[in-house]
Amino acid sequence: MGRLAVEQLAAGYVEGIDILTDITLRVEPGTITGVIGPNGAGKSTLLKAIFGFLHPKRGRISLDGRDISAMAPHEIKRLGISYVPQGANIFPQLTVEENLLLGAWVIRSDKARVADRLERAYAAFPRLRERQHRRATMLSGGEAKMLSLAKELVTEPTLLLVDEPSAGLAPRIVEQVYARLLEVRGQGVTILLVDQNINKAVHVSDYLYMLERGQVRREGPRRDFADQLREIVRDALLGA
């Protein structure tokens, strides 16, 4: 299903201080949930804690009622959670297509299903099709980020964690990335995304949380954030 619950989470430490101090949020199946906030608010730390790179000091993380707080990333991956970090998570020595095939191998599908997943990736990101036989080291930064996202999507995740999907990308590529996220949401994939592109995050998310200093400062459905966008942008970028 992909229902994620984070309850009173404290995690991530800098010089003995918790980055996340008391985070409670819900991500409903088949929705896009956006997380915004100023730099240093703990947004990326939240995704790392959910994926098992950081273990909570306090609190609980659960998927469909199952406690995953103490699981390692490879165990969480087996549950159908995929993580797209801010930097490109690809194998530079492999070609574009080999990276996608490696992602598809995770689900151990038959050849027809793998071919279908690759075709969907190429349809969503035509530049990857044009470069399918190039080594990943030859890609631009934007192309590498597209490949990083596509590689995780071919694993057919139940829950997708995406960190800063629009950072450093040209506007045209940002549109392609978000169009793909909306497409997979329509196919039932649950998405939790962090993005400094607040306008875009508000536009695509069904529900949003704004973090500040490791806590949830504001939450609500898209319409609430859209109605107060100027105030929210100011608070999210500068902190209140």
Language model regions located:
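ABC-type ATPase nucleotide-binding domains, specifically the catalytic core motifs of the NBD
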Residues: 14-15, 96-116, 124-126, 220
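The feature captures the beta-strand-to-loop junction immediately N-terminal to the Walker
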Residues: 36-38
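Helix-to-loop junction immediately C-terminal to a conserved catalytic motif
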Residues: 51
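Conserved ABC transporter NBD signature motif
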Residues: 59-66, 79, 113-118, 220
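C-terminal boundary and immediately downstream tail of ABC-type ATPase nucleotide-binding domains
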Residues: 81, 123, 210-219, 226-240
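Conserved ABC ATPase signature
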Residues: 135-139
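ABC ATPase C-loop
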Residues: 152-153
